[in-house]
């Protein structure tokens, strides 16, 4: 048991020596001594201890004072067993409230010492094991996050055909998320734009996100014509996602195919938020779409697209509901009203400026509240 490091804190030299002897009898030889709470805190700052046996009544800084200091930074605080007299029960209760694991009477009865110290050390071992597994899991999730973010395009200057500018951002609510965006240069001189949202969050949604992105990219190459119909693209993706969909995972999507030279194209919306049109007028939602189910919900569904024309100077704002449904600490939604008010003054700005303004407005609104959904924004402007 020499690997177990213990700290004994007591202002009585007799008690310190007695406890050190009892610990040595049970195989604990790595024992550090401290005369009071000040020395104890200095020792804890200097090295790692598996357990602290802490006296209650001491000069300079007593046991309760030490526990209060340790509670201020519990990350590196070792487990504590309070050394007390049975007449100090009220103080013992206070110590437990401050985080002490157990208490030990000053008689230092060997069987009781063995049992209580052994129980505390075992709990610490299990906590350390859980912390290590959590650390490894977080490292794996961070790696997955990096891999997921690498799937979506970032170099929009090489993607956008002449006459178009594009910007986008995606912020998962967890390490990995279910939102996606796509900006894809088409061989016929056009561009494919898409924002989609997978039901659910976390790793399962992240896997479906990657699958959906792959299906859309593959379908864009399979559908014939210089400007493939977005309805046909989503129909191909739906065939892949709806087959054997036992988990009932759905994907909402808004997909646009646009001719960069003429500004003409088509749009297909599958259960998703409709884009906003950005120009000199107040931002307004594109309308006239047929209500269509999300991808994965209805196998064999025949999706339909609508004509779309983007005049020089006009832009389109595509987003996921993580923007409009962002919540503050009072669980109020950001809402479309705030979104439209935010878009109005930047409606003629560059796509990058619109994206930046959106993320800043949402961050200001939530004011540090935990993010509950993935946030994705994509903006395109012609001319």
Feature-to-residue mapping (PLM):
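Two-component/phosphorelay signaling modules centered on CheY-like receiver
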Residues: 13-32
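Acidic catalytic/metal-coordinating carboxylates
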Residues: 14, 35-39, 57, 62-68, ...
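Acidic, metal-coordinating helix/loop segments flanking the phosphotransfer/catalytic sites
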Residues: 33-51
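A Lys-centered signature of the CheY-like receiver
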Residues: 104-106
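… and, occasionally, acidic/histidine-rich disordered N-termini of signaling adaptors
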Residues: 131-315, 367-383
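C-terminal catalytic subdomain
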Residues: 234, 254, 306-318, 323-383
């Amino acid at each position: 048991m020499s690997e177990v490091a213990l700290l004994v804190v007591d202002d009585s030299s007799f008690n310190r020596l007695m406890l050190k002897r009892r610990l040595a009898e049970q195989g604990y030889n790595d024992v550090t001594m401290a005369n009071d709470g000040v020395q104890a805190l200095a020792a804890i700052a200097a090295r790692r201890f598996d357990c602290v046996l802490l006296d209650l009544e001491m000069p300079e800084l007593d046991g309760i004072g030490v526990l209060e200091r340790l509670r201020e930074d519990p990350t590196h605080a070792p487990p504590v067993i309070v050394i007390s007299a049975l007449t100090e029960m009220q103080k013992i209760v206070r110590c437990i409230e401050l985080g002490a694991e157990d208490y030990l009477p000053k008689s230092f009865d060997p069987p009781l010492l063995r049992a209580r110290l052994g129980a505390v050390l075992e709990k610490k071992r299990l906590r350390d094991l859980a912390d290590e597994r959590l650390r490894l899991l977080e490292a794996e999730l961070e790696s997955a996050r990096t891999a997921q973010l690498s799937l979506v395009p970032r170099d929009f200057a090489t993607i956008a055909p002449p006459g178009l500018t594009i910007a986008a951002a995606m912020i998962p609510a967890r390490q990995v998320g279910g939102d996606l965006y796509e900006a894809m240069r088409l061989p016929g001189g056009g561009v494919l734009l898409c924002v989609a949202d997978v039901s659910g969050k976390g790793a399962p949604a992240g896997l479906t996100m990657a699958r959906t992105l792959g299906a859309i990219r593959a379908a864009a190459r399979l559908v014939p014509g210089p400007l493939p119909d977005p309805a046909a693209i989503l129909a191909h993706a739906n065939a892949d996602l709806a087959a054997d969909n036992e988990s009932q995972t759905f994907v909402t999507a808004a997909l646009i195919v646009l001719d960069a030279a003429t500004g003409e194209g088509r749009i297909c919306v599958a259960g998703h938020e409709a884009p906003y049109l950005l120009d000199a007028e107040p931002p307004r939602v594109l309308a006239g779409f047929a209500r269509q189910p999300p991808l994965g919900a209805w196998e064999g569904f025949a999706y339909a697209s609508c004509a779309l024309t983007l005049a020089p100077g006009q832009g389109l704002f595509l987003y996921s509901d993580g923007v409009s449904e962002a919540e503050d600490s009072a669980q109020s939604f950001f809402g479309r009203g705030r979104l439209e008010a935010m878009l109005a003054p930047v409606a003629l700005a560059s796509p990058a400026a619109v994206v930046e303004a959106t993320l800043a407005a949402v961050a200001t609104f939530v004011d540090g509240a935990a993010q509950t959904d993935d946030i994705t924004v994509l903006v395109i402007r012609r001319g």
